[in-house]
């Protein structure tokens, strides 16, 4: 469950100011944040995944954000990352490896998951998201849509209960958008909570 209570945030030099917002999202809900550029959609996603206040420098924050019982400003990022998976507008910004297989398992290895469990999560991810065509690939040889699909898979492998997607279709063509739509359908079927900041609504 996500609870945003009377939250205000103002960047030092950027748009995206929030003023006294309240938002409650129940487990399993899919919520789409829409609005003009600079209205604060991405800022809300950063409240949920902890980038605000843990990584965004400066700015003024007030109010309370609670994710699965954890007060975000008081919770270490690694604990938030166990619950909240983020897919960003530019997938290249979240890659840590050159080959696709290592990218899928990177988060699990970094979290100290035992090899047997890593193999199980890897196989479950490939099966659920139907990404066999991405395996054994060099990331630099992939299209933008394939990179986005791989980024989604690396998050899925971590098995978060909440997915946060920030403008995920911004750089995708029609086929890649349809692939993303199928992936979102899959996590909705599994009862995950989904928060999407988006300007395209037709694919949802």
Say what each PLM segment does:
Residues 64-79:
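ABC ATPase NBD Q-loop/coupling interface
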Residues 163-166:
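Catalytic Walker B motif of ABC-type/P-loop ATPase nucleotide-binding domains
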Residues 116-134:
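Conserved ABC ATPase "signature" region
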Residues 198-199:
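H-loop/switch region of ABC-family ATPase nucleotide-binding domains
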Residues 159:
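Conserved catalytic motifs of ABC-family nucleotide-binding domains
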Residues 1-4, 9-20, 52-57, 74-76:
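A short, flexible loop at the N-terminus of ABC-type nucleotide-binding domains that lies
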Residues 138-142, 146:
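Conserved ABC ATPase signature
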